[in-house]
A protein has these predicted regions:
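Internal active-site segments that recognize and position negatively charged phosphoryl groups
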Residues: 133-160
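C-terminal domain-closing interface element
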Residues: 123-128, 132-137, 143, 248-266
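Extended Lys/Arg-rich, glycine-bearing segments that form polyanion-binding/interaction patches
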Residues: 98-137, 144
Length: 266
């Protein structure tokens, strides 16, 4: 099986072009290829295929084999893949995901994609701050959906937020029947926030595009940030912009191809 390893701010996935490769058991394949010791290594598996409703289709599987509705860093890398590999000549195109159809705009440098801007859609924000009762403490959070579930937790310092304990406890809390992604967010000022993320099915990752959008949406709703915010993650920075007229979030960030290869792991 041929594959391509790609990353967006360190959030790395194994991509398979299903126009030329057949994948029969994606849940099993995701677990095999994501293994960083016995596999290729990554935060999950992304399958690129055809769509009757959009230019391309994206199916995402987390490192544990579970299905994901959407991935911001993953869809930026898909945009780079299909353009740089000659699968489209358009710099603006659509991708069908489990969270709906997303529109991408590729930003070129020397004829190749350097960054991608994605229309991430309308955030669905919980009406009130909720509280999760955990084994050793309670945690206040804001529930946000970007087509996938998020719990945004405000903290004073992202480096002393006990993520290794609170992340998995929040992810699997009964308040989230399908589990959730958890963002620990520190407001620097109205235009800047820092964030660490515990991703559902993958654990802590270097970045999360939908999580950054969820955090900014929660910040705007609370009156803590402006409509354009730089979100600093462990892997780098994303630019998140909220269009009030259309009530949609835009995410802009880099995408990089790491290497191509062939494996008989599957």
């Amino acid at each position: 099986m041929r594959f391509t390893k790609m990353e967006g701010l360190g959030n790395d996935y194994v991509y398979v072009n299903c126009f030329r490769e057949k994948v029969y058991d994606p849940e099993i394949l995701a677990r095999l290829v994501s293994d960083r010791h016995r596999g290729i290594g990554g935060d999950g598996l992304i399958l690129i295929g055809s769509s009757a409703r959009a230019d391309f289709n994206m199916d995402i599987y987390n490192a544990d084999g579970s299905r994901a509705e959407m991935c911001g860093n993953g869809i930026r890398c898909l945009g780079k893949y299909v353009y740089d590999h000659g699968m489209t000549e358009k710099t603006e195109f659509t991708v069908e995901t489990q969270a709906g159809i997303k529109r991408l705009r590729c930003i070129l440098q020397d004829g190749r994609v350097a960054a991608v801007c994605v229309d991430m859609g309308r955030p669905d924000i919980g009406a009130v701050v909720e509280t999760a009762v955990l084994p050793d403490e309670t945690v206040d959070f804001v529930r946000v959906s970007m087509g996938n579930p998020h719990a945004v937790v405000w903290v004073d310092d992202i480096y002393v937020c006990q993520m290794e304990t609170l992340g998995p406890e929040m992810e699997a809390h009964p308040m989230f029947p399908n589990r959730t992604n958890v963002e620990f967010v520190q407001i620097v000022d109205e235009d800047h926030m820092r964030m660490r993320v515990w991703e559902r099915g993958s654990g802590e990752t270097f970045a999360c595009g939908t999580g950054a959008c969820a955090a900014v949406a929660a910040g705007i709703a609370a009156g803590r940030t402006r409509d354009s915010v730089k979100v600093s993650l462990l892997g780098g920075t994303l630019d998140i912009d909220y269009d009030r007229q259309n009530e949609t979030m835009y995410m802009t960030g880099p995408a990089r191809e790491v290497f191509e290869g062939w494996t008989d792991i599957y």
